[in-house]
A protein has these predicted regions:
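N-terminal intrinsically disordered/low-complexity leader segments
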Residues: 1-12, 203-210
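Helix-turn-helix
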Residues: 12-16, 20-58, 62
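Hydrophobic alpha-helical connector segments
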Residues: 62, 76-107, 150, 154-164, ...
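Short, basic, alpha-helical segments at the C-terminal edge of helix-turn-helix-like DNA-binding modules
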Residues: 65-71
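Hydrophobic alpha-helical bundle segments that form small-molecule/ligand-binding pockets
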Residues: 81-84, 121-123, 133-160, 179, ...
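Conserved terminal C-lobe alpha helix of the protein kinase catalytic domain
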Residues: 91, 95, 130, 137, ...
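Amphipathic alpha-helical segments used for helix-helix packing
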Residues: 103-127
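Hydrophobic alpha-helical segments that form the core
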Residues: 107-115, 154-175, 186-197
Length: 210
């Protein structure tokens, strides 16, 4: 019984550390985040933080994983459920993604900040964020392959996937700048319409060029 309590307490303290680190890193970036600040925000001594994480680099990488799992729970890529109508599938999935971006943004805020930082030695958190993005793009390509069928070749699938993620990034940043001026759900739904038009254009161009 006492072991179970210790484990529960350990998990609870780890969650407090991760939440505090996510808040501070989102406010100050990687360089502005310190163990002392995390200690103050979480109410836990530095020794407790080091018990869970070897150093700040490892902690920030864990924050990326933790915030991604929370975000991903809200926006699963629908591998197996593709609407019969292509355009409906695109607008529905893009609107769902927009809702998730609007509702859970710690992962993207911190991840994009890390991605934009240039350091002599790459931070583990940045590497983790980029790896997650690549895995997400691969899953998105699998979904688009089902949605578009044989309409797009590999290059076309890669292009629409990159466009979808680039628009999501841009809308997120725009919402961070002006949270009253951007309806991410509506904008992402419109991007679904745009992707359908783009796919038709790419297919027609491929047919013309043979």
């Amino acid at each position: 019984f006492s072991l179970a309590i210790r484990r529960a307490n350990g998990e609870a303290s780890r969650e407090r550390v991760l939440d505090a680190a996510a808040q501070i890193a989102g406010e100050r970036g990687y360089e502005g985040t310190s163990i002392n600040l995390i200690s103050e925000r979480s109410g836990l001594p530095p020794s407790s933080i080091y018990w869970h994480f070897e150093n700040k680099d490892e902690l920030i990488a864990a924050v990326i994983d933790h915030s991604f799992e929370q975000w991903r729970g809200l926006t699963p890529i629908p591998h197996d459920t593709v609407a019969a109508d292509r355009d409906e599938a695109l607008t529905t999935s893009m609107r769902r993604a927009g809702r998730a971006i609007a509702d859970a943004n710690d992962f993207l805020r911190l991840g994009l900040m890390l991605a934009l930082e240039r350091r002599p030695e790459e931070a583990a958190g940045r590497a983790r964020f980029l790896a997650i993005r690549q895995a997400t793009r691969d899953e998105l390509e699998t979904y688009h392959r089902k949605v578009f069928g044989g309409d797009l070749d590999d290059r076309g699938l890669d292009l629409v996937g990159r466009l979808a993620m680039a628009v999501a990034d841009g809308l997120f940043i725009a919402r961070e700048i002006d949270d009253e001026g951007v309806d991410i759900e509506e904008a992402m739904e419109l991007m679904g319409v745009a992707l359908a038009v783009i796919a038709d254009h790419l297919r027609a161009r491929a047919e013309r060029t043979g």
